[in-house]
Design a protein with these regions (language model features):
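N-terminal glycine-rich phosphate-binding loop and ensuing alpha1 helix
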Residues: 1-27
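Short, high-confidence coil segments that cap the C-terminus of an alpha-helix
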Residues: 21, 78-80, 108-111
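Short phosphate-binding loop-to-helix
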Residues: 25, 31-84, 92-100
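Alpha-helix/helix-capping structural signal
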Residues: 31, 175-176, 209
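Histidine-centered beta-alpha loop that forms part of the nucleotide-sugar donor binding/catalytic region
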Residues: 49, 87, 118-119
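Conserved core of the sugar-phosphate nucleotidyltransferase
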Residues: 60, 64, 91-185, 195-198
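Alpha-helix termini
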Residues: 68-77, 108, 182-188
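Hydrophobic helical membrane-anchoring modules
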Residues: 179, 188, 195-228
Length: 228
């Protein structure tokens, strides 16, 4: 648990309090997540075993879930307008951020998606290294990629702000999932024209050291009384 709640509850609460989300579906093979999700009136999509391995790609699980949801809604004579993709291990999301992303797409029909985005200048590609055949560190990408190397230095901000899609939330139009192969790498489900939904220090939890960061974020930004 994180501050008294299961990790997967935070995105479920955010979704249930958003004024725009009409239905909640959860794709999982986990009985615990299924049980928790039903407390938030979520419909469960049974995730196939081949999509529930460490090697399975998130994009394939999203695509499977999308077509299952589409099938269910078509049987009710309904259509999908937008998909709000949330992640069981990404608690840095609120209903307000979801609403902001939806409103961005409602105002600009040329956008494919709106995703939560955070600045992480300390992890700039300028600082990234790889280990060569001799065991020494080399630039991961050529410095010329960032412009004139003479204008760059050890200041983490010297290359400008570095924005990362932080996996808190991806709000996408259906065509992004219908034709995922046309999307921008590496998160192809976001399409090509992606709007940021600005926030601070968003992340999905992959490592133990991230837990204190997420606890700080929840204490600072999580509003349990918010209704929209």
């Amino acid at each position: 648990p994180i501050l008294g709640k299961k990790l997967c509850e935070y995105p479920l609460i955010a979704a249930s309090k958003s004024k725009y989300i009409e239905r909640i579906f959860v794709s999982t093979d986990c009985p615990i997540i299924s049980k928790i999700s039903k407390n938030y009136n979520a419909s469960i999509i049974k995730r196939p075993a081949k999509l529930a391995t460490h090697e399975a790609l998130g994009e394939d699980a999203f695509r499977h879930g999308y077509f299952e949801i589409k099938r269910i809604l078509e049987s009710e004579n309904k259509k999908i307008k937008l998909m709000v993709l949330l992640f069981a291990n990404a608690p840095t999301i609120t209903n307000k951020l979801i609403n902001e992303g939806v409103e961005i797409l409602k105002k600009n029909s040329s956008l494919d998606s709106a995703v939560t985005t955070s600045i992480y200048n300390m992890w700039s590609p300028l600082r990234a290294r790889k280990i060569d055949g001799e065991g020494t560190l080399k630039p991961f990408v050529p410095f010329e990629t960032f412009g004139d190397p003479k204008t760059l230095n050890c200041d983490r901000d010297s290359q400008g702000d570095v924005w990362y899609a932080d996996m808190g939330c991806s709000i996408v139009r259906p065509h992004c999932l219908e034709r995922m192969e046309t999307g921008l790498l590496p998160q192809k489900w976001m399409g090509q024209k992606i709007s940021p939904v600005y926030q601070e220090a968003g992340c999905d939890i992959d490592y133990e050291w991230q837990v204190p960061v997420v606890e700080w974020w929840i204490k600072k930004y999580w509003d349990v009384t918010a209704k929209e």
